[in-house]
C-alpha cells in the first residue's frame, strides 16, 4: 500500500473530474424524455433504470482522487433520497455546476472561504423565494400529479400511489404473487423498532431488509453472549437452508451484534437483529403480542440464563417482511387465529375499561399491531428486471408524495429554482469572493432546467428566455408535451421538501469540496 498526496488545486481538479464523470453518466436519464440506462454488474440481473441514485451507485473510477469526488457526491445523493425519496439527479447537477464554477474562482485567486460564504448567503435567499412559491395540496388531483412526476411519469404507478397515500402510516410492502398492480388494505402489521445495524440490509438502494418469508426468534431478555445453544441454533438454520431469521431481543451486546454481522457478510447467513419494541415497562407484553401474531414461543421469560431450545418449533413465521432503521413490518404471521382473536378482544375490553388516557393510548397502539393498517401493493411485470425497477420507482414515489403532503409543492421542471434565482439581486456590499460565490449559486440552480431542456431537444437559453418573459410564476416548459404552459395546472410540480433538500445537500458537499486544501489517498502497489 502506498500513500498518494495532492496539493489543493491539483486535488480539487481531480475531484471535479470525478463529479463531472458521475454527472455525465446520470443526466441523460433526467426528465420526462430522459433515456434508460442499462446496468450489468457481474452475475447480477440486468437493470434498466432512469433513477439517478441507482445509476450513480454503479459508477466507480480508477483514479483514487476522482473516485473520492464520486464518493462524496454519492453520499449527498443518498442523503437526499433517504430524506425525501426523490431529487438525487437535481442535487447532482447543482453540485457539478457549483463545484466547476467555484473551482474557476479559486484558479483566479479568490479565497475559497469567501466563495463559500457567498454561496451560503445566496442559498438562504433562494430558500425564502422557494417558500413563497409553495402551494398546499388541495385535492386528490394534486396528489395524483405529484405522484406521477415522482414515479417518472408512469401513469399506473402514480395512480396507485395517489390511491393509497391518504391511508395512515403508509409504507409499501411488496409481493409478486399476482399479475398487474393492486392494493389490499389491512394486511400489514408494524412495530416501531428496526434493524440495529445497516450491515443487515438486503437492498442498499433503499436501506432496508426485504424477504418474502422469514422465521422469527423472540427473546424476552438481552442477548449478552452467543451461547453454545444459540450457535448450534444458527448452524441448524444454515444447514437446513430454511428461511431468513429475524432475532428480536430486549437488547444485543456489541460482540453478539458483530458476530451476527460477520456471519451475514462472510457466510451469507440471512439474519437480522431487531431490538424489542416499546418502552421498558411495556416491552414484555409487546413481545408477547408479537409471539402470538407470529406463532413464536417467547423464550427467556423466567431467567436470562435460560437455554434456547435447538428446534425450529419455537420459531414464529412471517410473510412479506420489510425492516427499516425504524420499523419492522410484515403482512402475515403464523399465529393461531383463535389466540389472536382472543388477544384482540382482551385489548378492546381493556381499552373500554381504562380510565387513564396514557394507558388507553398504549393499549390502542398494541391493538393497532393486531388490526394492521399497512397496504399491500403487489407488482409484477413481463420480466424480473422491469418488476424490480417499477418496485423501486413506486417506493421512491411514495416517499416523495408524502413529503409533498407535508410541505406543499412548487412548479416543477426546474422552474421554481429559475424563478427564485431571477428574483434575487446580488447585494452591493460584498467582497469579490463573496460576490462570486453568490452569483455562482444563482447560476447553478438554473442547471436542472437547462439539462431537462437539452434532454428534450430544446435550447436551454431559449427555454429560459420564454419562461422569464411571462409574469405567471407557474408558467414553464412541459417536457412531456413539449409545450409552455401553467405547470401546476398541467400537473408538473415537485414537493417543496424535495426541492429544498436537494439544494441543501448540493450546497453542503460543494462547500466541503471547495474549502478542502490537501488530499491524501491510498492505492495498492502494482
From Swiss-Prot:
Its EC number is 5.6.1.7. GO terms for molecular function: ATP binding; ATP-dependent protein folding chaperone; isomerase activity. The lineage of its organism: Bacteria, Pseudomonadati, Chlamydiota, Chlamydiia, Chlamydiales. It catalyses: ATP + H2O + a folded polypeptide = ADP + phosphate + an unfolded polypeptide. Together with its co-chaperonin GroES, plays an essential role in assisting protein folding. The GroEL-GroES system forms a nano-cage that allows encapsulation of the non-native substrate proteins and provides a physical environment optimized to promote and accelerate protein folding. One of its GO terms (cellular component) is cytoplasm. Changing residue 353 to R: In strain: CWL029 and TW-183. Gene3D superfamilies: GroEL, GroEL-like equatorial domain, TCP-1-like chaperonin intermediate domain. InterPro entries: Cpn60/GroEL, Cpn60/GroEL/TCP-1, GroEL-like_apical_dom_sf, GROEL-like_equatorial_sf, TCP-1-like_intermed_sf. Keywords: ATP-binding, Chaperone, Cytoplasm, Isomerase, Nucleotide-binding. Pfam families: Cpn60_TCP1. The gene is groEL2. ATP binds at residues 50, 413, 494. Forms a cylinder of 14 subunits composed of two heptameric rings stacked back-to-back. Interacts with the co-chaperonin GroES. This is Chaperonin GroEL 2. Belongs to the chaperonin (HSP60) family.
Amino acid at each position: 500500500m502506498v500513500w498518494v498526496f495532492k496539493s489543493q488545486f491539483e486535488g480539487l481538479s481531480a475531484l471535479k473530474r470525478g463529479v463531472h464523470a458521475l454527472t455525465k453518466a446520470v443526466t441523460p436519464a433526467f426528465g420526462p424524455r430522459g433515456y434508460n440506462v442499462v446496468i450489468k454488474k457481474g452475475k447480477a440481473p440486468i437493470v434498466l433504470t432512469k433513477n439517478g441514485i441507482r445509476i450513480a451507485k454503479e459508477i466507480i473510477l480508477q483514479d483514487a482522487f476522482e473516485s473520492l469526488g464520486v464518493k462524496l457526491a454519492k453520499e449527498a445523493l443518498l442523503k437526499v433520497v433517504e430524506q425525501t425519496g426523490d431529487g438525487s439527479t437535481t442535487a447532482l447537477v447543482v453540485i457539478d455546476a457549483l463545484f466547476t464554477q467555484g473551482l474557476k474562482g479559486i484558479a483566479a485567486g479568490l479565497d475559497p472561504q469567501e466563495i463559500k460564504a457567498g454561496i451560503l448567503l445566496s442559498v438562504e435567499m433562494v430558500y425564502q423565494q422557494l417558500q413563497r412559491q409553495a402551494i398546499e395540496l388541495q385535492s386528490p388531483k394534486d396528489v395524483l400529479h405529484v405522484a406521477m412526476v415522482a414515479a417518472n411519469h408512469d401513469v399506473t404507478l402514480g395512480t396507485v400511489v395517489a390511491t393509497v397515500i391518504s391511508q395512515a402510516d403508509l409504507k409499501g410492502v411488496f409481493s409478486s404473487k399476482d399479475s398487474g398492480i393492486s392494493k389490499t388494505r389491512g394486511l400489514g402489521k408494524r412495530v416501531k423498532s428496526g434493524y440495529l445495524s445497516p450491515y443487515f440490509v438486503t437492498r442498499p438502494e433503499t436501506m432496508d431488509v426485504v424477504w418474502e418469508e422469514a422465521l422469527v426468534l423472540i427473546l424476552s431478555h438481552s442477548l449478552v453472549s452467543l451461547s453454545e445453544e444459540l450457535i448450534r441454533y444458527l448452524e441448524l438454520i444454515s444447514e437446513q437452508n430454511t428461511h431468513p431469521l429475524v432475532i428480536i431481543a430486549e437488547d444485543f451486546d456489541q460482540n453478539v451484534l458483530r458476530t451476527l454481522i460477520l456471519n451475514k457478510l462472510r457466510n451469507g447467513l440471512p439474519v437480522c437483529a431487531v431490538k424489542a419494541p416499546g418502552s421498558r415497562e411495556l416491552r414484555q407484553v409487546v413481545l408477547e403480542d408479537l409471539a402470538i401474531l407470529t406463532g413464536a414461543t417467547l423464550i427467556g421469560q423466567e431467567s436470562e440464563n435460560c437455554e434456547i431450545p435447538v428446534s425450529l418449533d419455537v420459531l414464529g413465521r412471517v410473510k412479506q417482511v420489510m425492516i427499516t432503521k425504524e420499523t419492522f413490518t410484515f403482512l402475515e404471521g403464523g399465529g393461531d387465529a383463535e389466540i389472536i382473536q382472543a388477544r384482540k378482544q382482551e385489548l378492546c375490553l381493556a381499552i373500554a375499561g381504562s380510565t387513564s388516557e396514557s394507558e388507553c393510548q398504549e393499549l390502542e397502539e398494541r391493538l393497532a399491531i393486531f388490526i394492521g393498517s399497512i397496504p399491500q401493493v403487489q407488482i409484477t411485470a413481463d420480466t424480473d428486471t422491469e418488476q424490480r425497477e417499477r418496485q423501486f420507482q413506486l417506493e421512491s414515489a411514495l416517499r416523495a408524495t408524502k413529503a409533498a403532503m407535508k410541505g406543499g409543492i412548487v412548479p416543477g421542471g426546474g422552474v421554481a429554482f429559475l424563478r427564485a434565482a431571477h428574483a434575487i439581486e446580488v447585494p452591493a456590499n460584498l467582497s469579490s469572493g463573496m460576490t462570486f460565490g453568490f452569483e455562482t449559486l444563482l447560476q447553478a440552480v438554473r442547471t436542472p432546467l437547462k439539462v431537462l431542456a437539452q434532454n428534450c431537444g430544446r435550447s436551454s437559453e431559449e427555454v429560459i428566455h420564454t419562461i422569464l418573459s411571462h409574469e405567471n410564476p407557474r408558467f414553464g416548459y412541459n417536457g412531456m408535451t413539449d409545450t409552455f404552459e401553467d405547470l401546476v395546472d398541467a400537473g408538473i410540480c415537485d414537493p417543496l421538501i424535495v426541492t429544498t433538500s436537494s439544494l441543501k445537500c448540493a450546497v453542503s458537499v460543494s462547500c466541503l469540496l471547495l474549502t478542502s486544501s490537501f488530499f491524501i489517498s491510498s492505492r495498492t502497489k502494482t
